[in-house]
Swiss-Prot record:
This is Somatotropin. GO terms for cellular component: extracellular space. The gene is gh. PROSITE patterns: SOMATOTROPIN_1 (PS00266), SOMATOTROPIN_2 (PS00338). Zn(2+) binds at residues 38, 192. It is found in: Secreted.
Amino acid sequence: MGQVFLLMPVLLVSCFLSHGAAIENQRLFNIAVSRVQHLHLLAQKMFNDFDGTLLPDERRQLNKIFLLDFCNSDSIVSPIDKHETQKSSVLKLLHISFRLIESWEYPSQTLIISNSLMVRNANQISEKLSDLKVGINLLITGNQDGVLSLDDNDSQQLPPYGNYYQNLGGDGNVRRNYELLACFKKDMHKVETYLTVAKCRKSLEANCTL
């Protein structure tokens, strides 16, 4: 009986610490989702502003090219649809999100739009991406059980970004900006989706469908 009473405080402290960790985990998820939502909205606005400077024929042509082309981050293996996203573990979604954000740390510094239009807060984009990367890394650390073994998706290297647009031809500057902004918007939407699903799973909500 004495041993039971001795264990009671230990169990209470353990439950308290576990509850505190869960609250902190949700706080970090809330911050991460809020920040990526802001980045996604910013990416959407930047793309729309640039798209609005194009002539109709130019816009159609660039859209056709983009649909047939690929983004630099497409080499990062990620869920191809909502069903795969729902089946993916929280840790997998966090790792993919981390890699996607990491893939934009350098390209974000070149998000300067042609036709004399410059993103006023281009520097802030890089800062926000870096902050979000740190936050996601904290979430990965807080949500892994034991020693994490990295899969191929985590260890692979992206193609050198400097070579990505080297064969665009004479209209490369316009196409480069179009693809940069379109890819940035697409990837921020991906990260927003993955973090939202992961957050929902950890909050034990009844319905986490997309």
